[in-house]
Amino acid sequence: MADESETAVKPPAPPLPQMMEGNGNGHEHCSDCENEEDNSYNRGGLSPANDTGAKKKKKKQKKKKEKGSETDSAQDQPVKMNSLPAERIQEIQKAIELFSVGQGPAKTMEEASKRSYQFWDTQPVPKLGEVVNTHGPVEPDKDNIRQEPYTLPQGSTWDALDLGDRGVLKELYTLLNENYVEDDDNMFRFDYSPEFLLWALRPPGWLPQWHCGVRVVSSRKLVGFISAIPANIHIYDTEKKMVEINFLCVHKKLRSKRVAPVLIREITRRIHLEGVFQAVYTAGVVLPKPVGTCRYWHRSLNPRKLIEVKFSHLSRNMTMQRTMKLYRLPETPKTAGLRPMETKDIPVVHQLLTRYLKQFHLTPVMSQEEVEHWFYPQENIIDTFVVENANGEVTDFLSFYTLPSTIMNHPTHKSLKAAYSFYNVHTQTPLLDLMSDALVLAKMKGFDVFNALDLMENKTFLEKLKFGIGDGNLQYYLYNWKCPSMGAEKVGLVLQ
């Protein structure tokens, strides 16, 4: 947590795992299939509370399902406990968790060592305790790939979502908004906008069959989803065509049906059909076996609001006024020549990024078309600023994406606007100055908090710029690829 002289900041809960067919959670964000009620995927950090990204189990819903004649469909009646005060519900949930220690997802390697991973033990991933010194696939590419989709629970059917249809896109937005990643205290939930989802799910090379939905046959209600997007990944000395799996989400009322493992197997099957056999993904929980572990850090931009919604709290001997003074930022950036990225900058941004990432062990290999997609500014989605020197040369750039969280059960504040550090490349401007300006720009744009992982060179500026450490980790995983693990400073990949 933050130093005593600062406001203690609760990190946004990190992304949930992502997964693949028998893959990992993968960005395949991996999911903890041994504890399906917690499955929800995502890559980024959520609002405070914990950086685990794993959704808190809704035991009250599960108990209701066990009571006899209730069906497990998405049309079930609302749980009676919803009529209780939010604080009381949270107390009951905490109490239930105390009686089920060992049942939830592991947040640390120590906890993970005491778990059994029946699902992951069947997948081509290293075992948790395995020491890996080699590089290469866990199993060879498959020749005989299953042609038929995997079987879903009765009453459900597969549907490849056409996100070009605004109605379908809104359905996906609603599913994620109501069932995706929350922090462990059920105070914040990621709120991916429809436009953000198009950005995240339709990069160059996207395939419609990799937007894999599950619907109720009778009502056509969307109750499950998992996605894959193509990515060329450089891992140590090897470049591999992979996928990133993201947005694994199952409707809360279907969590007992073990739909998540079927979603993972099905997306993996579809990926295999396209000749891709490796994936990368992140998870806020520990699964077999992380290739790297990073931590979220959070920098207050609007400390009063963050404290009011309990994202942060006042440290000992700190008043609100002193806290606001502590986090005060300049009115404008100080780097000369800093301006929003334009179309003409795409080639040089591509060149700068490619050269910069060579120092890390796990990185994306982007084409110029991909750089345009991921970095060209879009309001409320992605911001990129370049530094142009007196000679008209672009020498540096910074970028951050927008991911708000819904604030649940608060009388005044309904949304927390969070900026997430993306890729920041420096050749002439010191990284500390570049990131100080990133904070100023985010504050000018109305963000409440600026989040960053401690990967790449980020550790060099986090404490100096008054970031507070989060209370959870984000694990990086590879599906069907073995290699030695690496420190956070060698991870050069940021997943949305």
From Swiss-Prot:
Residues 1-82 are annotated as: Disordered. Its main location: cytoplasm. Its EC number is 2.3.1.97. The modification Phosphoserine is found at residues 31, 47, 83. It catalyses: N-terminal glycyl-[protein] + tetradecanoyl-CoA = N-tetradecanoylglycyl-[protein] + CoA + H(+); N-terminal glycyl-L-lysyl-[protein] + tetradecanoyl-CoA = N-terminal glycyl-(N(6)-tetradecanoyl)-L-lysyl-[protein] + CoA + H(+). One of its GO terms (biological process) is N-terminal peptidyl-glycine N-myristoylation. Residues 55-66 have a biased composition (Basic residues). Belongs to the NMT family. This is Glycylpeptide N-tetradecanoyltransferase 1. It comes from Pongo abelii (Sumatran orangutan).
